[in-house]
Amino acid sequence: VMKSENGKIFAWKIRAVYAGMVCFAILLISYRPHENFRIACLDVGQGDGIVVEIENRWSILIDGGSTNKNELGKYQLLPYLKSRGISRLDGIYVSHTDEDHISGVRELLEFVEKDLTSLRIENLILPKWSDIQENKNYRELTELAESAGVRVLTVKAGDEIRYGTVRLKVLWPESTASGREVNEDAMVLEMISKDFKGLFTGDIGMVTEEKLIQNGCLEDVDFLKTAHHGSRYSTGAE
């Protein structure tokens, strides 16, 4: 009997440790400067995945991809959304179409299309590019979304989307962006709520950063998602 009880206790401890490891692996940083929203940067390896919850009413995903973690949607994105009680994404914002930003997004759209998840996705938001004929990933995401019944929106600098008291201002790309240089033409978002400002920079390089500075678009912010995962070729000192 003692062996059996010890075995049960030990098994419970193992499960608890495993659950803790899974939670740590999924969530890298949780940032909540105000009660009306929460920003979670997920540990997706070499890639990006950010979930923003707003006023307990709206949830959005900003990018979701990785080049070194397989089945990101199944093993990281969906489990995290479930752990937060999120059954609907009001928007998935794709900054650009490199694999390390879209692999998990593609999976989520496929799951919705095949009715393999209860998650609902309302909108897929892409940068407005004039030349997408050679961009297979862009066309694939658009087609998947349409097949899954997800509305596709394209945005450019000057556009703005509101979720209650939170505003998402599109700072980039310019209306003339072709999309041939996916990094430099990536979507840049500024999130504004009361006295808070956050900046999501995709993978823009220093050339685009300099243009945004010259245009007076880059101001002091409380939260910065560095471009190119913190690469020395992006997010300059200014």
Per-range role (PLM):
Residues 1-238:
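Non-globular, low-confidence helical/coil segments that flank catalytic cores
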